[in-house]
Every structure is written in C-alpha cells, then in structure tokens.
Amino acid sequence: MKTPLTEAVAAADSQGRFLSNTEVQAASGRFNRAKASLEAAKGLTAKADSLVSSATQAVYTKFPYTTQMEGPNYSATSEGKAKCSRDIGYYLRMITYCLVAGGTGPMDDYLIAGLDEINRTFELSPSWYVEALKHIQSNHGLSGDAATEANSYINYAINALT
C-alpha cells in the first residue's frame, strides 16, 4: 500500500540516497496532521452505523426509484437494502483506512482500482454513492483539523466517482 511517506522512502532507496530536506519536511507535515487524522478515524468509526444508516436513507430520498425497482441492484427488498448499506459502509471504511495510513493508498488499492468495471457490471450508479458520501460529509460531526482531514478523503472518493 502506497502512502506519501512510503513513496518518498522507496524513491530515495531506489536512488541510493538519503531523504531530501523536502521529503523530510513532507514527512514532518504528515506527522503533524496525524493526530487530527486519527481523531477523524475514531470519530467516523464511532458513528459508522448511524452515518451509514442515514446516508443510505439520503440515497433513498434523493433516488426513490432505488427502493421501487425490482432486481438485485436495487433496494426494493431487505436484501437489496442490506447490500446498499454494505457498499456505503465500505466507502466509509476505506476513508478511515486512508486517515490512518496518511494517504489515498488504501482507497486506490482496494476501491478505486476496478470501480468503473464493478459499477458497470452490477449496474450501480455512482451518483448513489456520491449522494451518500456528501451526506456523510455534512453529518459526520467532526470539526477543525479532524474535519479537514476526513473531508479531504471524502472528496477524493467523490472525485473518483464523478
């Protein structure tokens, strides 16, 4: 899994050199933000069930057809609703992993790679997940640096979907 820190170390090592001042300063900046990132990860994790539940409801409100259409890709059944919640929870989990890792590596490796193919294959609309993520962003209850850190990864996920 790549993070800005592991990439800097790998680049320096492959070139047989020590980290440059710029790379060390970047690492220092990351460590300064680490406390806020961990606070955000803890906050999102503590509220994960309620955030996923309310984000799922936000999707159903904005896209009511998702609960009216029959089929395995919609939420007309309890099984479909469970799948929707599971998928939204997966996005939120990836965001918390990124917060802990200090970079987009977890999301890049485990979510974004193949995202278009999955959505096409299962006829899933990215707009559903964008709505869910926007709802989470507006309702996570974080503030200050923790909110800034969380929102940066939420925005990254939203941009990957659009």
Curated annotation (Swiss-Prot):
GO terms for biological process: photosynthesis. Keywords: Antenna complex, Bile pigment, Chromophore, Electron transport, Membrane, Photosynthesis, Phycobilisome, Thylakoid, Transport. InterPro entries: Globin-like_sf, Phycobilisome_asu/bsu, Phycobilisome_asu/bsu_sf, Phycocyanin_a. It is a peripheral membrane protein. Contains one covalently linked bilin chromophore. It comes from the Bacteria. Signal peptide: none annotated. (2R,3E)-phycoerythrobilin binds at C84. GO terms for cellular component: phycobilisome; plasma membrane-derived thylakoid membrane. CDD domains: PC-PEC_alpha. Heterodimer of an alpha and a beta chain. Light-harvesting photosynthetic bile pigment-protein from the phycobiliprotein complex. This is R-phycocyanin-2 subunit alpha. It comes from Synechococcus sp. (strain WH8020).
